[in-house]
Amino acid sequence: MGLPWYRVHTVVLNDPGRLLSVHIMHTALVAGWAGSMALYELAVFDPSDPVLDPMWRQGMFVIPFMTRLGITNSWGGWSITGGTTTNPGIWSYEGVAGAHIMFSGLCFLAAIWHWVYWDLEIFCDERTGKPSLDLPKIFGIHLFLAGVACFGFGAFHVTGLYGPGIWVSDPYGLTGKVQSVNPSWGVEGFDPFVPGGIASHHIAAGTLGILAGLFHLSVRPPQRLYKGLRMGNIETVLSSSIAAVFFAAFVVAGTMWYGSATTPIELFGPTRYQWDQGYFQQEIYRRVSAGLAENQSLSEVWSKIPEKLAFYDYIGNNPAKGGLFRAGSMDNGDGIAVGWLGHPIFRDKEGRELFVRRMPTFFETFPVVLVDGDGIVRADVPFRRAESKYSVEQVGVTVEFYGGELNGVSYSDPVTVKKYARRAQLGEIFELDRATLKSDGVFRSSPRGWFTFGHASFALLFFFGHIWHGARTLFRDVFAGIDPDLDAQVEFGAFQKLGDPTTRRQAV
């Protein structure tokens, strides 16, 4: 046929059977990828430390999505929460992966069948005997079925009425587990961080979809609208479908990057804004202040800070710290976190407590500056010793650790103090194993960053695809030179402009 690569899809333009076939094959590829990727991730995933080496630090991409829908156990005998399990059954990570691969195989066979048996009676118009699809009716059927699935997910799966529920956690990502969720029908249901909104919105949207589907099945579009929106043209379907997909892609890119109840930090890692706003740091200080108010010692209050909470307050877990072309998981960057060293408290020789100014997200290097409680600079690590007034040596800065592995240990040696001051720029200080994975020490992004980048990029691409195909279908007559209302038989090649009798070719 000799079609250029960008026009090959014209082979299914007026062939409903093979159009169905290629879509089934596409579903086979998507489901096959999902199942295969899940098996690969399960092969390389280490579930031994859910606190310091969670799935998002290891670069898992599909495991978090399975987990948020209620899958927590593996045939390997482990649970995502760190415990063990004996009989996970079919609804395990491997079971879901296998189901996707089996479904992919069935779709593959169905695609071949529909490619071979493309000329089915169901695709033919009874009046003309030519292949034809009743697109408004198909739209109604699909809308109805999508509404049923949406309603079922919200009313049964999420609520736990017939299903496991979804992953729900506290605002600081410490107590997450799979549980049933009651729908939130009040104004709180519109809060993107309230899990009840997921149930209520799916129930509401599903109900609307069912009603809209029944409407489109029972009411035919007016002729003017049918012609104006080219409802008989399959490219109209392509254009509007692309619109639905790019809109959804933009929405999920936003909910992933900015965070929501659908993207828990235990599964996808914290957001960059939690570092920017000192979100976890504030909670840690709140707990410390509450402990001190109860006359507990600094050592006691810092020892009660959960290691998980301290680990979130570390810049290496900020998804915006990854760079372009830095492939690999976070563990391949700064290493595998082994343990929390504790919270360093710096003091000058006057006994003032000093705080290290933290590195902003988009800096690779940042001056080491120590300020007092009033924000006045008291010490730094100078760039030029000759100009220094506030160097660690001159000011006599010491550091003492509270909580963690170095609890109660103090240092006054300037070299050691400066080392920990530099590390305190990056948040809480952790011991990191860079040898095991040959980690290069350069920060990587988390799956939160990859998902956002991928979906935002494809959404932009699909936006242009929507404009392109929408324009093609709306202005097809202009582009082709054929009046869509032309009833006369047109002889191709008789006119210089197709269908225009004033441009009849003259025999030479």
UniProtKB/Swiss-Prot annotation:
<keyword id="KW-0812">Transmembrane</keyword>
<keyword id="KW-0472">Membrane</keyword>
<dbReference type="GO" id="GO:0009772">
    <property type="term" value="P:photosynthetic electron transport in photosystem II"/>
</dbReference>
<feature type="transmembrane region" description="Helical">
    <location>
        <begin position="237"/>
        <end position="252"/>
    </location>
</feature>
<dbReference type="GO" id="GO:0009535">
    <property type="term" value="C:chloroplast thylakoid membrane"/>
</dbReference>
<feature type="transmembrane region" description="Helical">
    <location>
        <begin position="21"/>
        <end position="36"/>
    </location>
</feature>
<dbReference type="InterPro" id="IPR017486">
    <property type="entry name" value="PSII_PsbB"/>
</dbReference>
<feature type="transmembrane region" description="Helical">
    <location>
        <begin position="203"/>
        <end position="218"/>
    </location>
</feature>
<feature type="transmembrane region" description="Helical">
    <location>
        <begin position="101"/>
        <end position="115"/>
    </location>
</feature>
<comment type="function">
    <text>One of the components of the core complex of photosystem II (PSII). It binds chlorophyll and helps catalyze the primary light-induced photochemical processes of PSII. PSII is a light-driven water:plastoquinone oxidoreductase, using light energy to abstract electrons from H(2)O, generating O(2) and a proton gradient subsequently used for ATP formation.</text>
</comment>
<keyword id="KW-1133">Transmembrane helix</keyword>
<keyword id="KW-0602">Photosynthesis</keyword>
<dbReference type="Pfam" id="PF00421">
    <property type="entry name" value="PSII"/>
</dbReference>
<feature type="transmembrane region" description="Helical">
    <location>
        <begin position="140"/>
        <end position="156"/>
    </location>
</feature>
<protein>
    <recommendedName>
        <fullName>Photosystem II CP47 reaction center protein</fullName>
    </recommendedName>
</protein>
<dbReference type="GO" id="GO:0045156">
    <property type="term" value="F:electron transporter, transferring electrons within the cyclic electron transport pathway of photosynthesis activity"/>
</dbReference>
<dbReference type="InterPro" id="IPR036001">
    <property type="entry name" value="PS_II_antenna-like_sf"/>
</dbReference>
<dbReference type="GO" id="GO:0009523">
    <property type="term" value="C:photosystem II"/>
</dbReference>
<keyword id="KW-0793">Thylakoid</keyword>
<comment type="subunit">
    <text>PSII is composed of 1 copy each of membrane proteins PsbA, PsbB, PsbC, PsbD, PsbE, PsbF, PsbH, PsbI, PsbJ, PsbK, PsbL, PsbM, PsbT, PsbX, PsbY, PsbZ, Psb30/Ycf12, at least 3 peripheral proteins of the oxygen-evolving complex and a large number of cofactors. It forms dimeric complexes.</text>
</comment>
<dbReference type="GO" id="GO:0016168">
    <property type="term" value="F:chlorophyll binding"/>
</dbReference>
<keyword id="KW-0157">Chromophore</keyword>
<keyword id="KW-0148">Chlorophyll</keyword>
<dbReference type="InterPro" id="IPR000932">
    <property type="entry name" value="PS_antenna-like"/>
</dbReference>
<comment type="similarity">
    <text>Belongs to the PsbB/PsbC family. PsbB subfamily.</text>
</comment>
<keyword id="KW-0150">Chloroplast</keyword>
<feature type="transmembrane region" description="Helical">
    <location>
        <begin position="457"/>
        <end position="472"/>
    </location>
</feature>
<keyword id="KW-0934">Plastid</keyword>
<keyword id="KW-0604">Photosystem II</keyword>
